[in-house]
């Protein structure tokens, strides 16, 4: 073999090995299927991925779980707190794809590949309620801070081309929710947040107000690396086509966003104040009678019914904390609807009965929403709406599909063909949405209170440990001093004795 031939062989082998390395570093469907799991990168947050008392949750998490299940592989979430870190993990092959509510932008299209879009959002500039509302870029007079690496930066750069005075700060330390809190505390004047994320957070921070949209609506999509194989992108195209057509995406969207489209500042503030001022008196009763239910859901139902007023009364004749009819109270064995404990006991018992009446094939949380609607409008009318849904080709076991048909019970051409006739079908839709909002907000406030209690307990334990350590050290020091003093006296006595001799 000549030296030239040997050199060619070395070059060919090097190129081949390099190609193999690239093959191993890039994501491919065959590789994912072979190893039996998929790594999905995301950002911690209420729209993506978070931990609850019942396990993991989040729109992106559940959608990613659906995708992993469709491939029959294990889902392994790789969460981060930083967009920059997220992109690095994708480029280095640590994750196979990103599912984090990422906008499709011009710059990102140059660096990554995207799956089909599944949602459209707009980006809102927000400020604190009570301050002067900025209606356009020229109205911005204070500090604007956004998350580093976000699509907000790209949109701000576009705006700066026609607004040369526009300035902003980019943070690698704080996420969108933390920046919202900085707006509320007055540390900064403005920030930018996606409309879906804002809808969730305004339930917890009602003082956040919208100034204006900084862009036209943008599509959200999952992201894969530039050198990912076509097979993984093809599988994503197939997956999103399936969840679009079978109603999975619609149901998931309703679960996380369907009940928060409308925001009422006064209502939200009033509820948060009631949680702090009124609820503590009745919380033990909700916990006592909820049993297998989440007591916070029972409390949310009660707030919707009576605003936690034990003597509440409606023109329809319902009364008490859970606003029971006289007939329902008798069925539940309740003697006095105005007795707070009896009312909560009766309401809990009746709601559990509504849940039990739902067909077993209806999964949670849909069966909970159906039970709430039944609690409000009656089981018969709910079934009428489910039948209409089925006749129209919808799924009668999905709340998102039935809720759109409930208002049809007010139209003669529909209710004349039902078993139970006319009903104000819009009421249970609003009723369920309200309770879901109250429940979400109460759950968030309750979890925050628990976190603060744990933090306080840890701080107290640390303080006690430090105090105990100081006491021990002081005791040791005193003992050492006494020993030293004793030794000194003994030495003096020895010296005196020797001198006397």
Swiss-Prot record:
It is found in: Cell outer membrane. GO terms for cellular component: cell outer membrane. The active site is at 305. SUPFAM superfamilies: Lysozyme-like (SSF53955), Periplasmic binding protein-like II (SSF53850). One of its GO terms (biological process) is peptidoglycan catabolic process. It holds the Pfam family SBP_bac_3. It catalyses: Exolytic cleavage of the (1->4)-beta-glycosidic linkage between N-acetylmuramic acid (MurNAc) and N-acetylglucosamine (GlcNAc) residues in peptidoglycan, from either the reducing or the non-reducing ends of the peptidoglycan chains, with concomitant formation of a 1,6-anhydrobond in the MurNAc residue. Residues 478-501 are annotated as: Disordered. In the N-terminal section; belongs to the bacterial solute-binding protein 3 family. Murein-degrading enzyme that degrades murein glycan strands and insoluble, high-molecular weight murein sacculi, with the concomitant formation of a 1,6-anhydromuramoyl product. Lytic transglycosylases (LTs) play an integral role in the metabolism of the peptidoglycan (PG) sacculus. Their lytic action creates space within the PG sacculus to allow for its expansion as well as for the insertion of various structures such as secretion systems and flagella. This is Membrane-bound lytic murein transglycosylase F. The gene is mltF.
